Swiss-Prot record:
Originating organism: Drosophila melanogaster (Fruit fly)
Function: Carboxylesterase that acts as a key negative regulator of the Wnt signaling pathway by specifically mediating depalmitoleoylation of WNT proteins. Serine palmitoleoylation of WNT proteins is required for efficient binding to frizzled receptors. Also acts as a regulator of long-range activity of Hedgehog (hh), possibly by regulating the switch between low and high level hh pathway signaling.
BP GO terms, sorted: digestive tract morphogenesis; negative regulation of canonical Wnt signaling pathway; positive regulation of smoothened signaling pathway; protein depalmitoleylation; regulation of compound eye pigmentation; ventral cord development; wing disc development; wing disc dorsal/ventral pattern formation
Polar residues biased stretches: 570-583
Gene: Notum
Protein known as: Palmitoleoyl-protein carboxylesterase NOTUM
Family: Belongs to the pectinacetylesterase family. Notum subfamily.
Secretion signal, residue range per the UniProt entry: 1-46
Length: 671
């Protein structure tokens, strides 16, 4: 049923595109590009909406495949030298019937790493529009989120799509894909024909179609073509909701339909919203906006979720209602005091104690909604979006950074784990459904029983073979082999005795007395030792001891979280006759497969905003200046004099305290 619907949508989309798309004017496009990118507005991208990815007709026909490969070759050959060559390169979709809101070509940005089987696909965010009025307003204010006519040829994105290891310690060398947001439907729409209710504009909403088409067109350029490939579908804000709604469908498309040996995971950043009563009544309630948007976009929702809400399927746009039905592993990052949630709740920038009280309750409600999430990272901060920010490595909970927690979760969801994570972390999150939360314990028990059974069978088989009588031919063959072994051993001993008789000196390894330990390598080492003077040998020993001490010191001082670097053993350098000055041994740094300190469920213990050291700074909405921490506490309605008395300090000392010191004291008091 769903496949037939999508076939019709694709056919209609081709006709509609030819009818409505307008030729682009190069000069006007250039002027719009310069004007737009000189001052891009900071868009609050709350992803309250999305719908599932679709089962459309297979786009990988021969002609389409040739076009995809040509696009990739053009992008690959256009890369120059320097930092510009590391940028993400633009590619339009080969299926031109799938478009942005205004009918312009949808597409993606790609930076391919030839030796990597990992793919990071990032869905952009940017709010949504849900009726004629809101879409017109969006077109006037945020046109770059509804058309591709202003897209540049290259993009540089930080965070999890950064190619720099200091900014992206674990995924800097993966294949990176950015899908710009131009459908205004939180990646959920399937409307291929223009909305006839708006006579002035002709909007299409194809977010789910765009995502599926991009994934399909990545296959010819390497996605899942090698066994053991991995796809991490990540999204921020509207993209975060898009990840949750499309994750299972994308996995089914790759694994079941395309028969690819690939592991699919999802990461939702700031896309987890609540349908609460707003602080003040808005012109259109958030629930009503979601319901209207679902109809306008013709959104497809996951069937497993809509079964739970048959009369109100649009409820599946909320993460806490959708999550229990997911089968593909999902990692959730969410600020406990999300700015987009505040916008949805119409609370505004927190200034008064009443606003702070409402926000405090909002944080508690959001924390409770994450109870059944098996992999979560939720700092007690006011913010929105983090995965694309260049300082995302600084966000920490309990000394575990966000990239480290994400890396731990990535390894915990692998089918075969032969590392320390299997013993040191919380239960695995390989399946996100709450009914399977304890399956890992039972699986380990079954594996133990199977190993015991296998060992018993092997032992019984060995005993049986031992008592069986060998035939005459088998006994003779075994006897012949033993005699040959004895002859070889005797011959080796005669050769060794002959060397000794001829005056050759053999260096015997005290740890291994086998004949193999005396060979040409030992003789060469002995000659080199004889050539060195006593002072040079002593200098060599000092250098080796110093290198070992430095290595042990680095291992002791290695941090428990953040960017984990471990030094390899110092390189051994050959000494020459004139090598009297010692050279420092070079150390090769590498990132370990799993951080030393892991955690799969990291929720901030304190319940008030900005109590985390790594929270983003706040600005006063009235003045635009950065708010001091005491100002924030005052706005929160706290009695500062009472706080000073509780901490045992005077007001002068309290006012002069640094933010980190004050947060430490308050956190210790709270604990």
């Amino acid at each position: 049923m769903a496949v037939e619907q999508i076939d019709k949508m694709a056919a209609k989309a081709g006709e509609a595109t030819n009818k409505w798309i307008k030729p682009q004017q190069p000069l006007l496009t250039l002027l719009l590009l310069l004007a737009t990118f000189s001052q891009l507005p900071a868009v609050c991208s709350s992803s309250i909406l999305d719908a599932a990815s679709l089962q459309e007709k297979d786009p990988l026909r021969d002609t389409s495949m040739n076009m995809i490969q040509r696009n990739y070759m053009v992008m690959h050959s256009a890369s120059g030298s320097g930092d510009h060559s590391r940028s993400l390169k633009r590619a339009n979709l080969a299926n031109t019937s799938i478009t942005c809101n205004d009918g312009s070509h949808a597409g993606f940005y790609l930076r391919k790493h030839p030796s990597s089987k990992k793919w990071i696909v990032l869905l952009e965010g940017g709010w949504h529009c849900f009726d004629v009025r809101s879409c017109r307003s969006r077109w006037m204010r945020l046109r770059h989120l509804m058309t591709s006519s202003q897209w540049p040829e290259t993009r540089d994105v930080g965070g999890i799509l950064s190619p720099h290891p200091e900014e992206n310690p674990y995924w800097h060398n993966a294949n990176h894909v950015l899908i710009p947001y131009c459908s205004s439907d939180s990646w959920s729409g399937t409307r291929t024909e223009p909305d006839t209710s708006d006579r002035e504009n002709s909007w299409r909403f194809m977010g789910a179609l765009i995502l599926r088409q991009v994934i399909a067109e990545l296959i010819p350029v390497g996605l899942g073509r090698v066994p053991g490939g991995e796809l991490m579908l990540v999204g921020s804000s509207a993209g975060g909701m898009g990840v949750m709604l499309n994750l299972d469908r994308i996995r089914d498309f790759l694994v079941n339909e395309k028969k690819l040996q690939i592991t699919v995971r999802g990461v939702s950043d700031s896309g987890w919203f609540l349908d609460r009563e707003p602080y003040t009544p808005a012109a259109v309630a958030s629930n009503e906006a979601v319901r209207q948007g679902w109809k306008l976009w013709q959104g497809l929702l996951p069937e497993e979720c809509t079964k739970s809400y048959p009369t109100e399927p649009w409820r599946c746009y909320y993460g806490y209602r959708l999550y229990p039905t997911l089968k593909t592993p999902l990692f959730v990052f969410q600020w406990l005091f999300d700015e987009a949630q505040m916008r949805v709740d119409n609370v505004g920038a927190p200034v008064t104690p009443q606003q702070w009280n409402y926000i405090h309750e909002m944080g508690g409600a959001l924390r409770s909604s994450l109870d059944n999430v098996s992999a979560v990272f939720a700092p007690s901060c006011i913010g929105h979006g983090v995965l694309f920010k260049r300082d995302w490595v600084n966000i920490k909970i309990d000394d575990i950074s966000l990239p480290s927690a994400l890396r731990c979760w990535e390894h915990s969801t692998r089918s075969r784990r032969h590392d320390k994570l299997k013993r040191s972390t919380e239960p695995s999150t390989a399946v996100s459904h709450p009914e399977h939360a304890n399956n890992q314990r039972h699986q380990r028990h079954r594996q133990r029983l199977q190993r015991q059974k296998h060992n018993n069978v092997a032992q019984s088989g060995g005993q049986q073979r031992k008592h069986n009588h060998l035939s005459k031919e088998e006994r003779e063959e075994r006897k012949r082999l033993r005699q040959e072994q004895r002859q070889r051993r005797k011959q080796r001993r005669r050769q060794q005795q002959q060397k000794k008789a001829n005056g050759g000196q053999e260096h015997r390894n005290k740890k291994d007395n086998s004949p193999k330990s005396s060979n040409g390598n030992d003789q060469r080492k002995q000659r080199r030792r004889q050539q060195l003077t006593a002072e040079e040998r002593q200098e060599q020993r000092k250098r080796r001891r110093k290198a070992q001490q430095q290595q042990m010191k680095m291992q002791r001082e290695q941090p428990a979280a953040g960017v984990f670097l471990e030094a390899s053993a110092p390189q051994k350098t050959r000494s020459s006759n004139n090598a009297s000055a010692g050279t420092k041994s070079k150390k090769r740094h590498r990132v370990p497969r799993v951080p030393e300190k892991c955690g799969l469920r990291l929720l901030e213990r304190c319940s008030w905003p900005q109590c985390n050291h790594s929270c983003p700074t706040l600005t006063n909405p009235m003045t635009g200046e950065e708010m001091r921490f005491l100002e924030l506490l005052t706005a929160f309605g706290l009695d500062i004099e009472a706080v000073a008395a509780a901490l045992g300090v005077d007001m002068h000392t309290l006012n002069n305290m640094e933010r980190t010191e004050l947060v430490n004291m308050l956190t210790q008091q709270a604990n």
